[in-house]
A protein has these predicted regions:
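Glycine-rich, phosphate-binding/catalytic loops in enzymes
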Residues: 68-70, 99
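Arginine/glycine-rich "motif VI" loop of SF2 helicases in the C-terminal RecA-like domain
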Residues: 70-78, 104-106
Length: 127
């Protein structure tokens, strides 16, 4: 809603099977209903100007690691903002750091994302 209040455009993309269990924001500029999670991710990737990763569960973790991997592979150059509130995502940063240290990865997550740890810093990104 904050993005809409400042003139931003918000597009929601939700698979049909999640419509009943999820809260759909009726204020979105547009809501797109798709059949599969893969279709959802494809549309989010195509339409997104940046990727904002909030604390979440297994679906969020899967989507986050995919978009991070795509950036590492050079598939996109869009900003990735990680809201690391109360160090929620610290273990993810640690995994990428360990991969680099162990020579299984070339990039640490810190170098390709914006790590935001406080609500005030998070809000300042959008003002």
């Amino acid at each position: 809603n904050a993005a809409l209040k400042t003139g931003g455009k918000v597009i929601g993309v939700i698979p049909e099977f999640l419509k009943k269990g999820e809260n759909i924001n009726l204020n979105n500029s547009k809501t797109i209903v798709v059949k599969t999670m893969s279709q959802r991710k494809k549309i989010l990737f195509e339409k997104g100007d940046a990727f904002l990763i909030l604390p979440g569960g297994s679906g969020t973790i899967e989507e986050a690691t995919e978009i991070i991997s795509w950036k590492i592979l050079g598939i996109h150059t869009k900003p990735i903002i990680i809201f690391n509130y109360k160090n929620y995502w610290q273990s993810l940063y640690d995994i990428y750091q360990n991969a680099k240290k162990s020579k299984f990865g070339k990039i640490n997550l810190q170098s390709i994302s914006i790590n935001v740890k406080t609500l005030s810093k998070f809000k300042s990104l959008f003002n």
